[in-house]
């Protein structure tokens, strides 16, 4: 019997096509296309596995499209800026710098926390932004500076409350095997990327609770995917992602929404310059033991610097997707719990989560392994 001979089947097919088309168009315009497609593909695959009839499958998909369209529509409802105040950490450069300028143009009162108040990034913010933006000295590894910023912010906003905190400050390290990364680097990454964000969160939560606002933590796709050579960085980003997931539930009763941003590869200053990599290389070599020297060799470390131009070339120079997602997290009436910013980021994270570990390791090993092997392995071969 032809499955399309009944009027019910044609009705379900038409409803699925119309609702699905509307959903995909809306998802495309909002930048959330990947998640919607994966969701619908999963539903279709599940229907096939359950051996449902075509009519039942189409009915399931049409209902799902309607539900996702409803959720997608509600997610697009934006709250008025209305002089809301936002604190952004790590605003010297990169995402934080661009975000501070972007929010200022939208009409927010912006508190831009910078590592160096007299640096070029801070000076550019003062020069190019409105009087609504304040540049504040804020090294997130120094509790006294965090408290000073809190006092200044509380004094300026008075009874308005602080609408959002964006924990963006972060550091990367020289890309090398986890065994070779000095403990000082592990501690620095943890101090900035995790403990700094946690302390900022704890200090400013009373202000967020007052406004029932937003806490936005910038993590990384590296928190979800075990890329080689970034053991210290990825571990800290995984920590902030889990911290965000836990306090998202804890703060819900206070009306505070917690959002995690997982950017893919973008060109920012976090990658560092040739000079900074030279210093990091020297630090690694200074910590070499005799056994490490025999097994790896200095040339193995030196060749990792060749990855710098490759990393930049593979990264997206347009950080608009990240700014768009953070803006949505701050402004949307019903923001998502997490955003995956960038090309293929969501699909990569889904693949890492659901593929067999052996397959994931094989792909990562073959596509992200240094060309030069350690000295001992080269000698053995």
UniProtKB/Swiss-Prot annotation:
* Quaternary structure (record): Homodimer.
Tell me which species this is from.
Rattus norvegicus (Rat)
Among the record's GO biological process terms, what is one? estrogen biosynthetic process
UniProt protein name: Estradiol 17-beta-dehydrogenase 2
Family, as annotated:
Belongs to the short-chain dehydrogenases/reductases (SDR) family.
List keywords of the entry alphabetically: Endoplasmic reticulum, Lipid biosynthesis, Lipid metabolism, Membrane, NAD, Oxidoreductase, Signal-anchor, Steroid biosynthesis, Transmembrane, Transmembrane helix
Q: What positions does the entry give for substrate binding? A: 220
Enzyme active site: 233
Tissue spec: Highly expressed in the placenta, and in the small intestine, and liver.
Question: Under which EC number(s) is this enzyme classified?
Answer: 1.1.1.62, 1.1.1.239
Q: What function is annotated for this protein?
A: Catalyzes the NAD-dependent oxidation of highly active 17beta-hydroxysteroids, such as estradiol (E2), testosterone (T), and dihydrotestosterone (DHT), to their less active forms and thus regulates the biological potency of these steroids. Oxidizes estradiol to estrone, testosterone to androstenedione, and dihydrotestosterone to 5alpha-androstan-3,17-dione. Also has 20-alpha-HSD activity.
Topology class, membrane: Single-pass type II membrane protein
Keyword S-adenosyl-L-methionine among record annotations? no
């Amino acid at each position: 019997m032809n499955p399309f001979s009944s009027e019910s089947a044609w009705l379900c097919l038409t409803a699925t096509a119309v609702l699905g088309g509307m959903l995909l168009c809306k998802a495309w315009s909002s930048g959330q296309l990947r998640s919607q497609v994966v969701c619908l593909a999963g539903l279709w695959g599940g229907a096939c596995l359950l051996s449902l009839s075509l009519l039942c499958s189409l009915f399931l998909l049409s209902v799902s499209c309607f539900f996702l369209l409803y959720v997608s529509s509600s997610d697009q409802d934006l709250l008025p800026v209305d002089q809301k105040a936002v604190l952004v950490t790590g605003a010297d450069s990169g995402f934080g710098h661009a975000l501070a300028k972007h929010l200022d143009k939208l009409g927010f009162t912006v508190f831009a926390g910078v590592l160096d108040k007299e640096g070029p990034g801070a000076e550019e913010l003062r020069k190019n932004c409105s009087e609504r933006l304040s540049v504040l000295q804020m090294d997130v590894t120094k509790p006294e500076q965090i408290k000073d910023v809190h006092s200044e912010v509380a004094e300026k906003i008075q009874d308005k409350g602080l609408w959002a905190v964006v924990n963006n400050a972060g550091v990367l390290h020289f890309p090398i095997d986890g065994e070779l990364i000095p403990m000082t680097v592990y501690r620095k990454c943890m101090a900035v990327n995790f403990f700094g964000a946690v302390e900022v969160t704890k200090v400013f939560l009373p202000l967020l609770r007052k406004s029932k606002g937003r806490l936005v933590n910038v993590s990384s796709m590296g928190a979800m995917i075990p890329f080689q050579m970034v053991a210290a960085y990825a571990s800290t980003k995984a920590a902030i992602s889990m911290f965000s997931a836990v306090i998202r539930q804890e703060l819900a009763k206070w009306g505070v929404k917690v959002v995690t941003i997982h950017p893919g590869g973008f060109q920012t200053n976090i990658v560092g310059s040739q000079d900074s990599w030279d210093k990091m290389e020297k630090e690694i070599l200074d910590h070499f033991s005799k056994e490490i020297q025999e097994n790896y060799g200095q040339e193995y470390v030196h060749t990792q610097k060749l990855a710098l131009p490759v990393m930049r070339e593979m990264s997206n120079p347009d950080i608009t997707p990240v700014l768009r997602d953070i803006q949505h997290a701050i402004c949307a009436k019903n923001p998502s719990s997490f955003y995956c910013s960038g090309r293929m980021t969501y699909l990569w994270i889904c693949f890492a989560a659901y593929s067999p570990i052996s397959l994931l390791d094989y792909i990562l090993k073959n596509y992200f392994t240094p060309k030069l092997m350690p000295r001992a392995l080269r000698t053995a071969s």
